[in-house]
């Protein structure tokens, strides 16, 4: 009898928070959502809530990977491949999410209209980022087929691309978080979704702050060609907030190598 009562008490204790997590944000008894809305939300969260932020994180903080003997080992393309794959996949998921909702949204409230405007802005930003990447210009440099190139010479075209690409990308990620929160509220999503997304975004911000403080946001130019002033781009100011440059000695000291 005592064991039965203890089991019942444990079940009740576990059922209460679980029921709270499964309940909609409004506290309604039931939650109903159209299939197209559910798939729209899943694809947008996959794209703008997961893949695109991770791709941006890889590009900002992993141009030199742990254990890489920079500047003896230059141009590690792991970050580039990760960034490109996740950005293309994220924009594809975004586009499919837009297609799922095309012509089906009927919300006329202020929150729904704001969500729609932000959503369209994010789609335009995503497509613009892909187009900008394709039009970023040539690479150049000692290891390329041609020495002269937009990136190696840091031409005005390349500088403009970097300024727009970096600022638009991070602004879009911040707006995506707001848009996703609005979507959860409009759909009256289960509370567990809000909890999971809150934990995810908190972890993302914490990782960003930690990596930034560690000085891992390294100039792309230096990561590719090294710190020598013989390379023209190293004689120009860095592009972007919080971007670091290192001498060979400073990087070795930071990495704990002699």
Per-range role (PLM):
Residues 2-258:
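Membrane-embedded alpha-helical bundles that constitute the cytochrome b-like, heme-associated redox core
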